[in-house]
Amino acid sequence: MTRKRTSPIRAVLRFAASVMMVSGVLLIADAALTLAWQEPISAYLAAQDQTALKHQFLKLPASKVRKHRAQLKGDAIAKIELPAIHQTSYVVEGTDTGDLRKGPGHYPDTPLPGEHGTVAIAGHRTTYGAPFRHIDSLSNGDRITIAMPDGTFVYRVYKTKIVDDSALWVKKKLSFDQLILSACHPLHSAA
């Protein structure tokens, strides 16, 4: 029995096809693992962080947040309630990756609730408990309550807008008090 010899071009094409098939399988496996493993695990870890933040928030002296805010980076400073989307979370000071893994984060360069200007808070829509997963479902008139150690502040949604991730103007101080909530869009994207 004689065996036909394959041409070098055919061998290269066969190898390339094999590499592409294996790559495709790996990409699908990565997506499946992300949904089946990473999201539930990160949600579990975020729930543990939120429990710790709750205890931290309940012990926080009323004067500490406003006077020593810089020292509270990564610590609980507030509780945010968004009844329209059935979400309650503890807010940390800061918006770095580590801060946002714990829960929504207050932009340090913006005022705190109760201070004049634009209060800005960021949160994840996917992973780490996804506190702002349904932020796109908020409608005009929906209530947002932020409890601080020294008082409770109620805001109403008056506008929703999708902006580019470089739109830092949304945090600009205006002549009136407002709250800006920010999260990545579309769902499952990250800026």
Task: Explain the meaning of each model-derived region.
Residues R3, P8-A191:
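Solvent-exposed, non-transmembrane regions of membrane-associated and secreted proteins
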